[in-house]
């Protein structure tokens, strides 16, 4: 029977990652996981993280990175995750000032467009983790559809 690869969203073990990054990755592998989705690098460089996922034979599937963190230095942040080997990077959540129905939502749309372009140049795809607040209509169109059309 063919084995179906399973990855762990590291947000679920974020406290452990903060205390013992390498030890947690080792344990994740020992538990039988094949890959991981990052939720922060906890002060580690991309090169350090890449070496660790290679050491423990874990596939770096993707990463959830806060929108404001990506927008602070898009080239570097997305470059780091590309260096690690992630194929996907997701905006996990929007703080209230960037949500649909606020003046900041246009910054979200513009930022997502930029992030998507940079991600594509680096061989990755930008994703968006939706929530209930994207299901409001703006000019007759759901905000989530506006975001997806942008990404």
What do these predicted ranges mean?
Residues 1-88:
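N-terminal pre-domain/capping segments
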Residues 35, 67-151:
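Active-site acidic/histidine proton-transfer and metal-coordination neighborhood
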């Amino acid at each position: 029977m063919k084995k179906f690869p399973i990855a762990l969203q590291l947000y679920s073990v974020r406290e452990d990652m903060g205390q013992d990054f390498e030890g947690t990755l080792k344990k994740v592998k020992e538990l039988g996981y094949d890959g991981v989705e990052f939720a922060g690098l906890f002060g580690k460089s991309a090169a350090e993280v890449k070496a660790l996922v290679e050491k423990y034979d874990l596939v770096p599937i993707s990463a959830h990175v806060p929108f404001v963190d990506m927008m602070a230095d898009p080239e570097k942040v997305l470059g780091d995750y590309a260096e690690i080997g992630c194929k996907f990077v997701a905006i996990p959540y929007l703080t209230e000032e960037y949500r649909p129905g606020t003046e900041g939502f246009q910054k979200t749309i513009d930022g997502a467009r930029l992030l998507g372009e940079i991600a594509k140049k680096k061989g990755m795809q930008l994703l968006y983790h939706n929530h209930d607040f994207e299901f409001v209509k703006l000019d007759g169109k759901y905000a989530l559809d506006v975001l997806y059309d942008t990404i």
